[in-house]
Amino acid sequence: MRSFQRVCDAVAFSHSQGVIHRDLKPGNILVTGRGVPKVIDFGVAKATSMELTERSFCTETGQLIGTPEYMSPEQADLGGTDIDTRSDVYALGVILYELLCEQLPYNVKQKALHEAIRVIQEDRPDRPSTITRVIRGDIETITLKAIEKQRDRRYDSAASFGRDIKRYLDS
């Protein structure tokens, strides 16, 4: 969990530099021999100062940019160009959910793209406490807040998400 809090700090730093990662997932987090997590693969990242267009989200063949399993509802919207740093917060929340529950909040890997988008945008994840009884209380609340469908109900930043993780760990 301390490593996860450090990942939140790293993402918060990239946000402070005006960069949205857009493809946060476990495969894009490396841990050094000293246990320091490093966020990698900023290949689809966007500067917050750049105007986002439909081409920023799709390839020539209409495929989404990013990994659907970790994608926020607003990023999954094929016509949506209005993403901000809370999209990365959502992806961090999915990573935390997966760490705690040993499964993703949604199973979209084998679904057709339109069905995966519907699940991401409409379905509610199972509460972590229904999957793993030891996960309840504050950590469950923190996790579910990070993966809220409505971004205005999520943490407003990776920094505030990381602070809540730190408070939880220190309590």
Regions picked out by a protein language model, each given a short descriptive name:
Residues 37, 53-65:
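Regulatory activation segment
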